[in-house]
């Protein structure tokens, strides 16, 4: 049989470890239940082959020298086939006729090396053995009936009908000798894997040794072989999964195209030759994977120039990640009973996954996940908004459900003081109340992120923690909070379309927002771990760079359609991009030589990038954590690096004209203007990149900066839990520093440079990435607002000065509220229209606010000499001092009778009408008086709460009511049920009261009294 091999191609394709650390809030909780059934075998499984036509799974028992045969119906080991020593790899032909077994007998003297393959005809159980010369590492059939054999020194094509073998390629010896050390898995000895696409057209494979690695792709049609040398950091896990049509594959933690371009890689992965596995269901767009990851990076402020090939210990518990096939976004995470240590095989329907695990084989019915207990929360975030004045408990609802509709137990907990959850456990579906006591966060005026962990004794998945965001702000803190879950790392305004874009790194997508409504329009998918966005100079396309992909994504901004990606040189990860008037550049993390980063130039027409041979007169060697940003006029591109280096690309000269290092380190915001000014961190740079000014540092760590003409906006914060500060700045001064509702996002260890500020082109608002998501600040956020002033405090019934606890009051002054707002909300709010009052530090429930008057209720627990303070967006008023009596009765003057208004609220029970000269009091009448300021009640009623009807809250101090000096019999004195701060006195009129037009009706209590004149007739 003759074979033609049209070409052999060797590429150098480095792949690197991800450098993105996981958020602490997403830490996995401890597990109880696991997913999958373990089928132990007496020996060590080295490979499996699925025979669906017979309902069997063949298991290569490497140490027991046999093939164990498992029923896929009941998972029992039905039989075993004794074979030659060390069965290492298996493959079954597409017609299910042949089972091919590779025997790895690479023993050293004095033992005999037996390197061969066994071919079993499954239709008639006949066997043949064929010597391979060199030890075989793996085997795979293609749809044409032939098999590919990889040995320690090359690739061989095998015809099972004739037994002919043809060497396709040779490479450096990848073999390991036997015997091996104790406690060694077969995958550590063989360290190779290959797999065929579902259509049988393509085989992908990898083989490793301590010093070499081979990656190859074989196309059965035309017998085309592509051999590609990989230098990978970390070394790819020797597991292979292939798309059904052979158009891409997973080699361990790496998703590769046919040319070995790294399209996506699992973040933060580390070297492992033993633990882990992958399986591809390309029809469903899913990858199943166990990939070991490193601990979050916390000790450095910048990405190192050389990435270590870290090695992790086995994860506890072992987990199976369900990933989106295009960009490896995690859909769900399942607890495994034990680690995967070899091949994983999916059924043709994709409903069952068989994997080699530590005890033998584990069966994972992935198509029946809805029949297993799982948990999911209805929201990633719970937002609790309070204020300095609103100290009432804030309650939000969160639904816990089983995605399959089942009834699953759950526990939800928080370790934060002031946070309670009710119920803390239960059975799904369930709605829990998350209650936050703002008093526990009274020292914070920003946003505190509190993880709510969800666990279960029966759920097989590990739901991520829910982020509880507690914001307690003062009225003078500016901005409207918009909750956006996830790890947000970049923002970019689109002037041409009145939009802005936010990069959501953990979900691998760009969120598109309307610049007028601030509502999300759509989401654009990216590759893995997106780091920065850029627009082409013509503003037509959006570009996205990544830390875990060797391509940059491209989107048409008018249609939102994804375009052909930009492919970068092998080993280059485009973390930052920028477009000038004549060049599109990228700063790439370069692992081709294990060295620093490089600047690449992009040919946008061909969608390819090429490393610049030099940066003008300077060597092309930059810090991989650096960033690029263009001037809006396209004249230049600024390069900023955390080690203090700065560079400038001049578009007119088409070269790098400046390279300086005046500072030892840099981090924070970065920006370039159209007026030859630049900003990095706190440093203002001139056209020569010479520092000519330093911005103030007292307000905290710099976060965002954006030039507007020759000045700019800037945000800072001392900590993520503090309120942020936004200010207008120029080279030498900061103007009008204004407190924000919460902190802007601050630099991190893996993202030393941040872009968090986006002024909208129509100058309507400034958008800042902040702790909760983003904050909308009006363009005139710092417009002058006069501070509030308090002039007087009176009771709200008749406008006199005596006031008492629990009574309704009117506060008069100036600049008391920017708006007029009345509320019927119950309980009464303690913040209304961005204004709030406190008395002795206790918030006042409010009914109405305006520029010159506020109506509210004095707190029930204040007395004596008091201090009132008003907070508004204009600031905090001077202290106003007044006295609070234990009782200060005052009758309302809000009655209306015909054309008469402002009447005292005293009613005759006989007809239910107001007492007037035409509806006078008669002896033996029962009258009802409505008043305020009558003090404490029994039982007590909380401030701002309506009075109950049962039991009735009676006044603690009984009032005296006289009519013309004659005492009236008090039937009831207390709060009106359903009302706040309104008291009712029911009294009977004796027969001996005097008659007249102006008989004094007096209500006296605790030395204070109120009086009015009424008409009394017989």
Functional labels for PLM-detected ranges:
Residues 367-478:
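Feature for long, exposed domains in two main contexts
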Residues 339-372, 748-784:
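Blade-level signature of beta-propeller repeat domains, shared across WD40, Kelch, NHL, RCC1
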Residues 64-66, 105-110, 154-156, 208-212, ...:
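Short glycine/acidic-enriched loop and turn motifs that connect beta-strands
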Residues 44-49, 86-92, 134-144, 173-198, ...:
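Repeated scaffold domains used in trafficking and secretory/extracellular systems
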Residues 779-1018:
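A sequence-level detector for low-complexity, Ser/Thr- and acidic-rich stretches
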Residues 33-40, 76-81, 125-131, 164-185, ...:
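A short beta-strand motif characteristic of beta-propeller blades
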Residues 71-75, 121-125, 159-163, 219-223, ...:
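Short loop/turn segments that connect beta-strands within beta-propeller blades
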Residues 57, 99, 147-148, 203, ...:
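Hydrophobic beta-strand positions that form the internal "hydrophobic ladder"
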